[in-house]
Amino acid sequence: AAAQEAMAGLAEAAPELAAEAAGAIAEAAPELAGFVAAGVAEGNPEVAAEAALALADANPDAAAQIAASVANANPEFAAEVTAAMAEANPEATADMAAAVAQFAPGAAEAVAAELISNDPGAAAELSSAMAEANPAAAGAIAAAVMDVAPEAAAESAAAMAEANPAAAALAAETMAEAEPGVAAEMAAAMMEAAPEAAAGIAAGVAAGAPDAAAEIAVSMAEANPEAAAAVAGGMASAANGAAGDIIAAMAEANPEGIDAIA
């Protein structure tokens, strides 16, 4: 706490010295890296990225801690700082993103959007790492994917569900609400990756795209007939006003499974 307060004062009074001082402290006392990063972000966020880079350069193993500390101290600058650190150390990007999701979830969407827009091909990997670290941030992560890399929605959704089935419902709801047209494809990909999360996926899709719930329920049940009952239950719980239509559509598509579905 003392190191954080001291760095905040230094960054505000003499910003040109912040990065050099941060690097020196990280070399002498690596356990203080997170506090130093947070202090700079609080005192003068304009130099937070430069200081974070100096800290990570002096202590690469603390990259995730540094990114999370900055995001916690000043969420508004989290995306800029994390992106700069990721550019300097690409191999630590997923760890940094996961740390932000876990310890500074309020900055998760902005950080995910910035990192994924810089490297759309990494959308699934980053989504997976962040959702595994904090399933409660899955909605924010999914929103970021839909905003900057919608073409990666299905792959990212599946990666999140596989990494942490508890993230499935929030991710499915957010993506289905943003683009109902991809809901069926996304739900099928998630079901394939994490069949044990069928009920959560179905509930999320129904909450996000209630008008398409019956149609999507049928496609989900066709993709995995053994999960039909879980799909029906999840859909009905989230869109109970449409439960009759959902069950009727599923029963019509799979008459032999009517008992389990009902």
Q: Where on the chain are the PLM-derived regions?
A:
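General marker for long, soluble alpha-helical cores
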Residues: 1-262
